[in-house]
Every structure is written in C-alpha cells, then in structure tokens.
Amino acid sequence: MSPAIKCLILLAVIALFFVTEIIPLAITAIGGAVACGLLGLIPAKQVFSGLSNSTVVLFAGMFVVGAAMFYTGLAQAIGEKVVHIFGTGENSLMLGLMLVGTALSSVLSNTGTCACLMPVALGICAASKNPASRQLLPMAYACGWGGIITLVGTPPNIIGSGALTAAGLPGFSFFEFAWIGIPLSVAGILYMLLIGKYLLPKAELDADQEIEQEIEATTHDKKKQMISGMILLVCVIVMALDFKFISLEMTAIIGALVCVLTGCLTEKQAYSSIDWVTIFLFAGMMPVSTAMDKTGAGKLIANWAVGLMGGEPTPLIVTIVLFSISCFLTQFMSNTASAALLCPIGIAIAKQLNADPKAVVMAIAV
C-alpha cells in the first residue's frame, strides 16, 4: 500500500472520530500525529513539531490576555455601560447587546464574551420587563460573527493562518478577516433588527435563574480593569501594525506575561484560561497536514475534488463548494476541528488550480 493511500485512510479515520467524538478531539489529533510517525509517513522527529509551531504560542498568549478582561470584570463593565447607553427598549437593547458582543468577541473568546454578557442581559431585561429570550439569541449570534473580524477572534481563523504558514505561504494579517467580518456583522445586525426579531421566541425566562459563566470575575478593581484593557489595546495595535521586530506570537506572550505580573490574573488562572483542546488539536493536525503534502495524499484529494467539479472549476466554484462543506461539517463537529481538517485540503486544491489559497482558507475558516 502506498504512503498516500495510508495517509488517506488515516485522514478518513480522523474525520470519523472528529464527527462522532467517540474519543476527545485533542486525543484524536495527537493520535493522528503519532500514527503518521508509526506508519512512516513523516520522520519521527516531526511527530510533535506542531507543539513548537508559533501559532500555538499565539493561541496561548491571546487566551490569557483575553481572560484578564473577564477576571478583572472589565468585559462585564463594558457590557453594562453600553447597554445603559442604548436604553431598555427592545430594539435599542438588542442593538446595544449585539454591538458590544460583536466588538468584544472580535478580540476575546466568543464563548467567554457571551457568558459574561448573559447576566447583564438578564438583569436589564428583568428590570425593563423585556422578554430575555428575545435578547439572548441575537447577542449569541453577535458573539459568533464578531469573532470573524480579526485573526485572534476565533480559533479557526488562527488555524487557517497556521495552515498557510505550514504550507510555506504567507499567513493572514491581523485585520485581513475584517473584509468579510465587518460586512457580515453589519448584515447580521440589520437582519436581526429588521427581520430576525419577528422570528424570536416570546417565552419568559426566570431572571433569577443561575447562569453558569465560563470565567467569573475575581475582582472589580478599577486599576486592574484599566491595566487589562490597556494590555489588550496595545496588543491589538502592535499586531495590526505588524512590526518587523516583533511577531504576533511575541506580542501575545508579552501581553500574557504582563497580565500575570500586574496581578490582572494569577498564574493558575492563566493556565486554566488556555483552551488546551484547541492547542493540542492544532498541534496534532499540523504533522497530519505535513504528511498529506509529503505523501501526495493532498494532491490525490485535490485531483479527485477537481474531477468532481468538472475538471476545470473556477476558483469561485471551489471556494463556494468548500465553504458549503465547511458549513455542513460544523453542524456535526467542532468548528475548530472542521477548520483543522479542511484547511490543508483547501490549500492543496487551490495549488492544483493555481488559485489564491488565502481566499479558499478564509472561506473555510468563516
């Protein structure tokens, strides 16, 4: 059996485990990397090369910087302030929650932002006699599409950039996703205000029910809130300016170190704020991606996919097809796992057609 066929079989097994989650995603990814080494698809010394990838460092650093905003209570304070500015009318409250959700989730954890804003939304809704069920769903949507705006907004964006870098191509800049993220966010907000609100449930929620937050604020010290906000702002500015003497991952780690040194969060909180599943999933899939490239499995998939699309599909058709596949897969599996699985395949297809891999990868990540 040729190495390419072995790699394809392994990829199919990984995809099956990703969809069914019979075993944890991180275990599947790391197991896939180990299998690549055992099958001789890549040299043994490359099996854990993903753990030293600079993208892993970027992930870890930004998880900590973002968590500092939650632990100091700054994220919740911003949410409360914005909601009070917009008022308690149904439409104005919905707009305020969506705007703050979009803005915060563009640089912070989507889930963390949503969990942080939920008590704010419930409290305001209870005081203003607004049905909370009509505010929570638009807010959750906003936290989802807000993550598309920047490179660090959501793990699939960073995974896509890492896949490009691993393939020897330039990765995405910090605000490159904004070309899609901002118009999509504006369209989403307008849709919810003009059409979506009529489709929302009208059931009342118990305002006193306990909401389990991803990260509880451990302090409301104004000084620490200001420090955590300044750290995030400086990180975003430095990443956006893309200085040659300091990389994205260096910026993220420096920001994380300053967060701990200034007491915005403890060392233990910093460790717990890192999404280790995302870290190991990405680190495990990088060697699998390398194996696909070296064995020719990626090219086989690309040739097969191109053949299914008529032999000479336009880059637009390829992008639409991969976007649709990604949307379909994320209904059954983690969006992070979906991106890790599809990005290397998308790059292989783009190379086969001499198309821009960035456009294809961006469509998959979005």
Residue ranges and their predicted role:
Residues 1-60, 64-66, 176-303, 319:
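Hydrophobic transmembrane alpha-helices of multi-pass small-molecule transporters
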Residues 3-4, 22, 51-52, 69, ...:
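Alpha-helix capping and helix-loop boundary segments enriched in small/acidic/polar residues
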Residues 6, 65, 127-142, 146-214, ...:
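Juxtamembrane and boundary regions of transmembrane helices in multi-pass small-molecule transporters
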Residues 13, 27, 31-34, 38-128, ...:
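Membrane-embedded alpha-helical segments and adjacent helix-loop junctions characteristic
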Residues 14-23, 100-109, 141-152, 237-244, ...:
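Transmembrane alpha-helix interface/packing and boundary motifs in multi-pass membrane proteins
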Residues 27-32, 110-117, 137, 149-153, ...:
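Hydrophobic alpha-helical membrane segments of integral membrane proteins
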Residues 40, 70, 83, 87, ...:
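Non-catalytic alpha-helical coupling and interface elements of nucleotide-dependent molecular machines
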Residues 114, 138, 175-176, 188, ...:
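Active-site-proximal structural scaffolding
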